[in-house]
Curated annotation (Swiss-Prot):
GO terms for biological process: chaperone cofactor-dependent protein refolding; DNA replication; protein refolding; response to heat. CXXCXGXG motif repeats lie at residues 151-158, 168-175, 190-197, 204-211. Zn(2+) 1 binds at C151, C154, C204, C207. Homodimer. Residues 4-70 form the J domain. InterPro entries: DnaJ, DnaJ_C, DnaJ_domain, DnaJ_domain_CS, HSP40/DnaJ_pept-bd, HSP_DnaJ_Cys-rich_dom, HSP_DnaJ_Cys-rich_dom_sf, J_dom_sf. Participates actively in the response to hyperosmotic and heat shock by preventing the aggregation of stress-denatured proteins and by disaggregating proteins, also in an autonomous, DnaK-independent fashion. Unfolded proteins bind initially to DnaJ; upon interaction with the DnaJ-bound protein, DnaK hydrolyzes its bound ATP, resulting in the formation of a stable complex. GrpE releases ADP from DnaK; ATP binding to DnaK triggers the release of the substrate protein, thus completing the reaction cycle. It comes from Rickettsia canadensis (strain McKiel). One of its GO terms (cellular component) is cytoplasm. HAMAP family: DnaJ. Its main location: cytoplasm. CDD domains: DnaJ, DnaJ_C. This is Chaperone protein DnaJ. A zinc finger (CR-type) spans 138-216.
Length: 375
């Protein structure tokens, strides 16, 4: 007995819709071809089984019919189809089986499956690394990647120039053929046109009838000002070209921002370490601070500033996408104590030390902290 759909999803037959959905998403993520190792055919097979199982069990009517007739009944239909000897490529779609079941026994009308030889191209992802200044100002970047592009010889239709594309006479352009199996009417992909519904007598030599071919591409992409690390930018229609004139997929550019030597980013705010002399910390003053847009601004240091204090420069942080508002820059004060003193400097500090020791100052003052370090 082959594994039924409940076993494939790892749930009981009484599982709720929410439990089915949770199990499906977990398994689909695990066995998705993008996450599987290259050449892992077992993962691809498992992924198809998971999708087929969930497609039936998520639908209440299909699930009821499946529970009634069972998985083996479905498998037996396949066995009888190949019982005449030789090989068979018969792989009926469970949707077709249940679709015809409800059509024949519940008075519904079976709709013809819409088919087309046109297939949308795949989406592409490109990882782009920029620096913080580029993220602040915005920039245009020329990126290079390879993808399927529309054939410029046949203009995407897959046929040699001047040749016509005809409707498949085996399936009348539907892309599927029907066979009767007892009370089931089963559809299978047309063997003549491979489900395209059309026949190309003389395929284009450049693209071998696919309407596209592989090529190295260059594209100028615009990175807006204020872009954040991890931002994904969509470029509609810049993915892989579709098959036989199908719509192109999209290109997704994922942004990574390099770490900066001076600034650390926190949303739209910037943080930086600002070294100042102990004289400026004690007496106050002004120091020049570099800003992200280039140049410097003056920052006022209040008298008595302590090591580790934080001073804010408003609207000197990062720009925000699609906004005129900017973040702030927060400077973290680091008081530097001189290591090499001149004779005169030492004399002045010794004099200051004597005067300080004769006074009763608050233990948390800057100068008492300095005395405790020097004692």
């Amino acid at each position: 007995m082959s594994q039924d759909y409940y076993q494939i999803l790892g749930v009981s037959k009484t599982a709720s819709s929410a439990e089915l959905k949770k199990a499906y998403h977990k398994l689909a993520k695990q066995y998705h071809p993008d996450n599987a190792a290259a050449g892992d055919t077992n993962a691809e097979k498992k992924f198809k089984e998971i999708n087929a199982a969930y497609d039936v069990l998520k639908d209440e009517q299909k699930r009821a019919a499946y529970d009634r007739f069972g998985h083996d009944a479905f498998q037996n239909q396949q066995s009888r189809r190949g019982a005449g000897g030789g090989t068979s490529s018969f792989h009926p779609d469970i949707n077709d089986i249940f679709g015809d079941f409800f059509s024949d026994f519940m008075g519904g009308s079976r709709r013809s499956r819409p088919t087309s030889s046109k297939v949308r191209g795949s989406d592409l992802k490109y990882d782009l690394t920029i620096n913080l200044e580029e993220a602040f100002h915005g920039i245009e970047k020329n990126i290079s990647f390879s993808s399927e592009v529309q054939c410029d010889t046949c203009h995407g239709n897959g046929s040699e120039k001047g040749e016509t594309i005809t409707t498949c006479d085996a399936c009348s352009g539907v892309g599927v053929t029907r066979i009767q199996q007892g009370f089931f009417t089963i559809e299978q992909t047309c063997h003549k046109c491979q489900g395209n519904g059309q026949m190309i007598k003389n395929p284009c030599k450049k693209c071998h009838g696919m309407g596209r071919y592989h090529k190295q591409r260059n594209l100028l992409v615009n990175i807006p000002a204020g872009v954040e690390n991890g931002t994904r930018i969509r470029h509609t229609g810049e993915g892989e070209a579709g098959i036989r004139g199908g719509n192109s997929g999209d290109l997704y550019v994922d942004i990574s921002i390099k770490p900066h030597d001076i600034y650390k980013v926190d949303g739209a705010n910037l943080h930086c370490k600002l070294p100042i002399s102990f004289v400026n910390a004690a007496l106050g003053g002004e120091v020049e601070v570099p800003i992200i847009e280039g140049g410097k601004v003056n920052l006022t240091i209040p008298a008595g500033t302590q090591n580790g204090d934080q001073l804010r420069l408003r609207s000197k942080g990062m720009s925000k996408m699609r906004s005129t508002i900017r973040g702030d820059m927060l400077t973290h004060i680091h008081v530097e104590v001189p290591k090499n003193l001149s004779k005169r400097q030492r004399e002045l500090l010794e004099e200051f030390k004597k005067e300080s020791m004769s006074e009763k100052e608050n233990d948390s003052s800057f100068f008492n902290k300095m005395k405790s370090l020097w004692s």
